[in-house]
């Protein structure tokens, strides 16, 4: 019978036995999970059952107690929920508060907006588009960087790939972005990407380090970029990381652009010690380091060039262009030192003894040779490059006697002036500049008539030491090279103004079949304007139109150099307006400079009036120019009597004071502003160079 009663408990549409077991389980638990209907349903199952059970007295007592317990649970739970859901019943809990914060609906709405903005930043919208791979993002970023869209590439990587798709980036994703930052010198962002790369436990490749050194070389802040590059180099040396030749060239580029030639030679020695082959590109970076020395850079560049030729390395067109840049920007240095180093043969200069105190160190150097280059050659070249005038008597014997005097030549006369040495040539038969052909570009022995250098002060003089226009182009032809438009533009800058060589440049263009551009003609226009030949500069404009070249703002700026008269300057501004070209601050600055040279204050006021009419913002350069124009001469005495100059400068000072208050100011843009997604002010701009994260 007990089994029959037990089966009845678990039979029927609502088994009572299961309800009892559920109730017993829930009583033993600490939390009711059945909701509000649970206690009522349990009580109905036990107490509202229509089928009486023939149980014993003990069982009936237990059932009645269960019904009473369930009724208590059903009455207590709704009361607790009512207390929790009721409003205004919490005053008893907070009756002891003494301080209350004032709040309004507007403040609450602002708090909700701020919380909503933070949630949007912390939790970006889920990506609902097509799922892409890391390599797809690599090629997309590479394409955008080639198109000059670095900001779009960074946004694609940081927002879409990392935040929206939440992909784990690879090493190539970081390397391509660091390389893009290297092209524009965005140093801070490049090292941020590099540090984030290390945080993700990604191993940088050789291309990554090459891109990092390249971004240091292209940074606008050279000092901080050099410190970052040296710190990275120290970390690589501490890890005994072997750099390849491309990475060494990037490091050599940093040393050439941000440091000096000594650091370049230090990196050059390390390249040889690591067993890398020295190429023409290596020597090109050494030439860039020579150009940084404006005083003796041309002499050092010629020494590096001759060393490269002695090793049998064929030069490139880029190397010839660097020589022209050295002739344009750098000097020869001490003429006596230059004569001793450049007018002697390569065999004599390569064996110069080391300075005092370095004899023992020179003996311990291993003669490690890589493709014809040894440390001994590099150290000898270093001693020649930094030879001081006080060391010139400690070298090999003096110049051969045949170079000073000739048996068939009469006695020569020498004159010495401070700072330079004149050429030692016979007075009776002194050759002219065109008759004496000199070219330091070759390793052959020069003519015995060339004894020493004379005055080498202008770029045209330095070009003459390389054979002149035709001699320079002839050397390029010997190496199988043809000049490009950059070569001819540099030649236009270094040839003598107004000479036959300058007038023959247009024929050289046609002879070598080089297509001219606006930069080439701007160079010719600027040179004629500096000579005061404004009409000659304007005569080049029809040639531009004949070749289908459209003048740009720099063309008008070069024309403004020669506008020394007020009517020329005002006519130039009128012609620009007719051509629908708006004059910018650079054109006005050039006109102000031309007026300052003539001290024409009427001309200055006319320029300022036109500048105010066009609402051109003023920059710092123009303000410095006008402040200088508003100053009285140091020897000027206003109390000696009436002076027309005083009246003019006083009138200009009065107008300039009112003009400056009404003019808008030009804000200098940040070099990295166009590549940042956020404004520059929102970021820390004090650390301009970024840096490396230790570890």
Curated annotation (Swiss-Prot):
Any one cellular-component term (Gene Ontology): mitochondrial matrix
Keyword Lipid metabolism appears in the UniProt entry: no
Gene3D superfamilies, per database record: Tetratricopeptide repeat domain
Keywords carried by this UniProt record: Mitochondrion, Repeat, tRNA processing
Localization: Mitochondrion; Mitochondrion matrix
GO biological process: mitochondrial translation; tRNA 3'-end processing
Biased composition (Basic and acidic residues): 685-695
Ranges occupied by PPR repeats: 133-169, 170-204, 205-243, 244-278, 279-315, 316-352, 470-485, 517-551, 552-583, 584-618
Location of region: Disordered: 391-416, 672-695
Similarity comment: Belongs to the PTCD1 family.
PANTHER family in UniProt: 2-OXOGLUTARATE AND IRON-DEPENDENT OXYGENASE DOMAIN-CONTAINING PROTEIN 2 (PTHR24014), PENTATRICOPEPTIDE REPEAT-CONTAINING PROTEIN 1, MITOCHONDRIAL (PTHR24014:SF6)
Function: Mitochondrial protein implicated in negative regulation of leucine tRNA levels, as well as negative regulation of mitochondria-encoded proteins and COX activity. Also affects the 3'-processing of mitochondrial tRNAs.
Subunit note: Associates with mitochondrial leucine tRNAs. Interacts with ELAC2.
Name this protein carries in UniProt: Pentatricopeptide repeat-containing protein 1, mitochondrial
Originating species: Mus musculus (Mouse)
Lineage: Eukaryota, Metazoa, Chordata, Craniata, Vertebrata
């Amino acid at each position: 019978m007990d089994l029959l009663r037990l089966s009845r408990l678990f039979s029927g549409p609502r088994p009572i036995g299961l309800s009892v077991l559920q109730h017993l389980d829930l009583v033993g638990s600490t939390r009711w999970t059945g909701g509000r209907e649970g206690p009522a349903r349990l009580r109905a199952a036990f107490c509202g059952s229509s089928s009486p059970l023939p149980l014993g007295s003990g069982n009936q007592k237990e059932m009645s107690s269960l019904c009473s317990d369930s009724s208590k649970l059903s009455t207590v739970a709704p009361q607790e929920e009512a207390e929790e859901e009721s409003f205004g019943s919490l005053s008893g809990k907070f009756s002891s508060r003494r301080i209350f914060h004032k709040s309004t609906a507007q403040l609450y709405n602002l708090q909700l907006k701020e919380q909503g903005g933070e949630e949007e930043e912390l939790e970006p919208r889920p990506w609902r588009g097509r799922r892409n791979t890391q390599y797809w993002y690599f090629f997309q970023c590479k394409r955008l960087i080639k198109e000059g869209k670095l900001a779009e590439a960074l946004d694609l990587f940081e927002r879409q790939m990392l935040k929206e798709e939440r992909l784990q980036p690879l090493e190539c994703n970081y390397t391509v972005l660091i390389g893009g930052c290297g092209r524009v010198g965005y140093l801070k962002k490049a090292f941020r990407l590099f540090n984030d790369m290390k945080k993700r436990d990604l191993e940088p490749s050789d291309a990554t380090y090459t891109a990092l050194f390249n971004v240091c070389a292209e940074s606008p802040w050279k000092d901080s970029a050099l410190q970052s590059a040296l710190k990275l180099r120290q970390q690589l040396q501490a890890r005994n990381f072997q750099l390849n030749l491309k990475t060494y060239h990037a490091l050599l580029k940093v040393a050439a652009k941000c440091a000096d030639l000594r650091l370049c030679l230090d990196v050059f020695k390390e390249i040889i010690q690591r067993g890398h082959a020295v190429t023409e590109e290596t020597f090109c970076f050494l030439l860039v380091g020579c150009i940084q020395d404006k005083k003796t850079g041309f002499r050092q560049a010629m020494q590096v060039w001759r060393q490269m030729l002695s090793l049998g390395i064929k030069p490139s067109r880029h190397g010839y262009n660097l020589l022209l840049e050295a002739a344009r920007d750098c000097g020869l240095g001490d003429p006596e030192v230059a004569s001793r180093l450049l007018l002697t043969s390569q065999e004599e200069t390569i064996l110069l003894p080391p300075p005092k105190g370095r004899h023992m160190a020179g003996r311990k150097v291993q003669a490690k040779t890589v493709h014809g280059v040894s440390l001994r050659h590099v150290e000898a070249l270093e001693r020649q490059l930094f030879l001081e005038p006080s060391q010139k008597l400690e070298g090999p014997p003096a110049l051969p006697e045949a170079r000073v005097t000739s048996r068939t030549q009469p006695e020569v006369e020498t004159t010495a002036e401070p700072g330079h040495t004149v050429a030692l040539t016979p007075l009776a038969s002194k050759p002219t500049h065109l008759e004496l052909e000199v070219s330091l570009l070759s390793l052959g022995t020069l003519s015995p008539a060339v004894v020493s250098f004379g005055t080498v002060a202008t770029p045209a003089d330095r070009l003459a030491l390389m054979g002149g226009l035709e001699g320079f182009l002839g050397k390029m032809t010997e190496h199988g090279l043809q000049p490009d438009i950059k070569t001819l533009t540099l030649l236009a800058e270094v040839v003598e103004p107004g000479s036959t060589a300058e007038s023959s440049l247009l024929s050289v263009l046609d002879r070598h079949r080089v297509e001219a551009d606006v930069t080439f003609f701007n160079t010719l226009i600027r040179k004629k304007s500096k000579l005061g030949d404004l009409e000659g500069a304007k005569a080049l404009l029809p040639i531009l139109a004949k070749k289908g070249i459209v003048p740009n703002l720099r063309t008008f700026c070069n024309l403004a150099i020669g506008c020394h008269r007020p009517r020329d300057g005002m006519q130039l501004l009128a012609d620009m307006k007719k051509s629908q070209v708006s004059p910018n601050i650079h054109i006005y600055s050039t006109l102000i400079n031309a007026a300052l040279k003539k001290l024409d204050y009427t001309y200055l006021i006319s320029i300022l009036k036109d500048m105010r009419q066009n609402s051109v913002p003023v920059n710092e350069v123009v303000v410095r120019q006008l402040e200088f124009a508003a100053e009285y001469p140091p020897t000027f005495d206003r109390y000696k009597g009436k002076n027309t100059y005083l009246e003019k400068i006083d009138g200009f000072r009065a107008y300039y004071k009112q003009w400056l208050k009404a003019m808008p100011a030009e804000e200098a843009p940040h070099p990295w502003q166009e590549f940042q997604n956020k404004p520059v002010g929102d970021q820390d701009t004090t650390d301009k160079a970024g840096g490396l994260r230790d570890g």
